[in-house]
């Protein structure tokens, strides 16, 4: 029996908590302990074991400490297996590249950002080159359809499988009929967080050019922390374009139910990041019948079209009539069949964890 250790290698509380909750509340009820129980998590503030009684969680104060713990285990027992959830930890990449961790010991679920090279400068170019080499030294890679297509071009010999992030969704809401009011200004959601990859200011200018100032704009920027300067820049531009009445910037992270209620009020989402991210928010918008604009560089468009969902591309002509038509198309889709919705993504996780421990699927 192979024990699988799940690695959350960077201190990203929101995403890490989602994964831990999914394993504790869902997978632990049906899968064997050796597949789901053992976690190593980077968390400066720590994690309460009482919140996840079905799991055994070892916390490390930072990424480097976590990487050292994983490397020590990998070297002490070459039969030990690791499942990397996301992978924003340079020390682990270097350990794979140097052979301290063997390819056959590692499966990796891509979260998106680690595939893309957005920073500039000599230091980053060198690191990206090393990371590309390390990413070819993985036993098995799991990702969205679009990310797999990107990865397979660069590492064609590595086995891959489709797998979706376990978005927190209430399946009962998928059946809910949503009627969008046709009167009054449209409400547009810009971005899924305060991260600069959302390119908030560029999105606000594009919305103003397409729709004028007679739309309501909501910008959630509750995380990441220590982001006050960028938030102030976005707020200044948003108020100048749309005015106090039509521009709302959310500086605090909303409780989940409040976030859902906010999404229900939207007519359109606007997400122009040039990579796969924000799938959780995209799933919830689809559930509520809200179409969205995405960049052509975001490979998740391949997953959307595979599920026969309407796609609005950033840079194309857009007006209210096209938005309403996308809403109509979205309403006609059988959302219960969407592969990246709960509970449809569960089978992918069952298969992935069995594969990672060398068991038949």
From Swiss-Prot:
GO terms for biological process, alphabetical: enterobacterial common antigen biosynthetic process; fucosylation
GO cellular component: plasma membrane
Membrane topology reported for the UniProt record: Peripheral membrane protein
Enzyme class: transferase
Residue ranges of coiled coil: none
Subcellular location: Cell inner membrane
Keywords linked to the UniProt accession: Cell inner membrane, Cell membrane, Glycosyltransferase, Membrane, Transferase
Superkingdom to which the source organism belongs: Bacteria
InterPro entries per the UniProt record, alphabetical: WecF
EC number: 2.4.1.325
UniProt GO molecular function: 4-acetamido-4,6-dideoxy-D-galactose transferase activity; fucosyltransferase activity
Catalytic reactions on record: beta-D-ManNAcA-(1->4)-alpha-D-GlcNAc-di-trans,octa-cis-undecaprenyl diphosphate + dTDP-4-acetamido-4,6-dideoxy-alpha-D-galactose = alpha-D-FucNAc4-(1->4)-beta-D-ManNAcA-(1->4)-D-GlcNAc-undecaprenyl diphosphate + dTDP + H(+)
Purpose: Catalyzes the synthesis of Und-PP-GlcNAc-ManNAcA-Fuc4NAc (Lipid III), the third lipid-linked intermediate involved in ECA synthesis.
NCBIfam families in the cross-refs: PRK02797.1-2
Family of the protein in this entry: Belongs to the glycosyltransferase 56 family.
HAMAP family: WecF_RffT
Protein name, UniProt field: TDP-N-acetylfucosamine:lipid II N-acetylfucosaminyltransferase
The gene coding this protein: wecF
